[in-house]
Amino acid sequence: LIEEYIETVGEFGETRTTKETRAHFYEGIMYFCWAPFANYCAHHYAEYESAELDKDLPFLFLHGDNDSGKGMFLRFGARLISNGYVQEVTTGGDFVKDNIERAQASDTVFPYIVDDVAKSKIDRDIIKSYWEGKWDGSIQMPTFIFSSNDSTKPKSELRTRMKTLDFNVNFSELEEDEREAAAQIAGQADSCNLFPWFAHLF
């Protein structure tokens, strides 16, 4: 399923960097599988005096133009690690301070996934110091997965706290049957049972 989904980059998309973009899609899927274990890793890193959790536990930032498949990718990842229970993600308009603070107190390991968030909402101190001073191991805190259409990336001090993947592909010229085929491939995430297998190995 993973290979079939990543192949949509070359099969249905327009890109001059097919190999690199496929690699970024794959890295993104690996991040989704890792995301529920961020707190597990935090416990490990916190044992060291040199730990900087906000750098040791980077968020995932998907950067690309409109129609680069970021939204479908986020939904695919959410469905993949929830066996289809989570089908939609948060929109950028809901990414506000109150909701970020609720996430810090939510006691959940499922990532906070935000589609099409403005760069100005990411360039904030609450993101810069999300883990430090908030995480003490008593409750679980979700990591963040963002996508943005903004032409510029977050400022440099934020980029050290994020894994940035560029989706240099365009799916805007898809025919209806191609869109249906791509959606059908993504829909298989609901029942593939990949994440329980991955979690067991982890």
Describe each PLM feature range.
Residues 83-88, 144, 162-164:
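Conserved beta-strand scaffold positions in the cores of enzyme catalytic domains, especially
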Residues 43-52, 131-141, 150-155:
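Conserved Walker
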Residues 99-147:
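Conserved nucleotide-sensing/catalytic segment adjacent to the nucleotide-binding pocket
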Residues 77-108, 124-125:
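Short glycine-rich substrate-engagement loop in P-loop NTPases that contacts/grips substrate
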Residues 16, 53, 59, 67-68, ...:
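Conserved C-terminal RecA-like helicase domain
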Residues 33, 62-66, 116-118, 146-151:
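Short, flexible loop/turn elements at secondary-structure junctions
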Residues 1-82:
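P-loop NTPase catalytic core of nucleic-acid-dependent motor ATPases
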Residues 24, 109, 153-202:
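Feature primarily recognizes SF3-like P-loop helicase cores of small DNA viruses
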